[in-house]
């Protein structure tokens, strides 16, 4: 257990660390711009007859930049209403969620993204705030690298050792 590579083997609900993904989809689809605003319901939003979302503060009107800065669950849930389930699912797959990465290491988890046929009316809203899916740390790092690299996925490399100029191992 102590030798387990948790970066690739443990899948978890990413929560707020995932919110940049629906933001990227919204910008990609041009459904919103960073200066557009969303009303965040003063901190409590009824998604369906028995499901409420809350923010940690009672926000009213927030720009997309502020929704990201303040990590507004309500803002992201409403943002997700601007795209359909299939677009979100395809975007998640594009970023590598729900599949193993390119590395060849044992015990890598693919995480879990349910097929859209198994989504509820509120799944898209919950996925946008990092719930109802599971991912690995490597998958999240790869997704962030796609954003940092202008939409291009750079294949990760596994480093076996590092040598100094005298070809002595400095890391193994």
Residue ranges and their predicted role:
Residues 1-16, 21-172:
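Beta-lactam-recognizing serine transpeptidase/beta-lactamase-like catalytic domain environment
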